[in-house]
């Protein structure tokens, strides 16, 4: 009886050993193929100045997994750029290749609403026109001052609203 158990155990051991050898041989073939490719690299079109600018992160990082969480949409798979570089760049982002015109347009533009000094007969809401870009900081300040002056001119031309005089005493007695 002992010899029967020994022969069954030996047969089982040989069967398991052969099966393990076949599985190891099949696993080694795919494992050798990725070694030639190297590590997975994330493709970036540009590098954002701020991670809080979701539009920039979505535009620049082409290989990102976006996960919807309860409060916000969070990007995963991003690295953290050096703070020195983020502080030194006044622009929105920095392009990886200088020849990418779409990236240069996205990263280096500034959208500010352009204010036009309107005649004093127009309402201040009619003064603003959007869609043009400014390049100099002084233009924004000048345009904001023009808007303020237009609002003041418009307010002076409006007829004053007459208010009813409120009596100093109340008709109703408090009890």
Swiss-Prot record:
Residues 1-21 form the signal peptide. Residues 93-108 are annotated as: Endothelin-like. Residues 22-43, 67-175 form a propeptide. Keywords: Cleavage on pair of basic residues, Disulfide bond, Secreted, Signal, Vasoactive, Vasoconstrictor. Pfam families: Endothelin (PF00322). GO terms for cellular component: extracellular space. The record marks 66-67 as: Cleavage. Disulfide bonds join 46-60, 48-56. It is found in: Secreted. GO terms for biological process: angiogenesis; artery smooth muscle contraction; axon extension; cell tip growth; cytokine-mediated signaling pathway; endothelial cell migration; energy homeostasis; lung alveolus development. InterPro entries: Endothelin, Endothelin_toxin_CS, Endothln-like_toxin. Its main location: secreted. GO terms for molecular function: endothelin B receptor binding; hormone activity. Belongs to the endothelin/sarafotoxin family. Vasoconstrictor. This is Endothelin-2. It comes from Mus musculus.
């Amino acid at each position: 009886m002992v010899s029967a158990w020994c022969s069954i155990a030996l047969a089982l051991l040989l069967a398991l050993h052969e099966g393990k050898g076949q599985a190891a041989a099949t696993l080694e073939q795919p494992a050798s193929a990725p070694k030639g490719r190297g590590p997975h690299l994330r493709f970036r079109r540009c590098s954002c100045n701020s991670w809080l600018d979701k539009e920039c992160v979505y535009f620049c990082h082409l290989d990102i997994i976006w996960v919807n969480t309860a409060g916000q949409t969070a990007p995963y798979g991003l690295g953290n750029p050096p703070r020195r570089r983020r502080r030194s760049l006044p622009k929105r982002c920095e392009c990886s290749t200088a020849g990418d015109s779409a990236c240069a347009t996205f990263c280096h533009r500034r959208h500010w609403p352009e204010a036009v000094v309107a005649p004093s007969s127009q309402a201040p809401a009619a003064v603003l026109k959007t869609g043009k870009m400014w390049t100099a900081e002084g233009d924004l300040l000048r345009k904001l001052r023009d808007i303020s002056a237009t609002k003041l001119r418009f307010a002076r031309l409006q007829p004053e609203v007459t208010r009813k005089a409120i009596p100093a005493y109340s008709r109703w007695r408090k009890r």
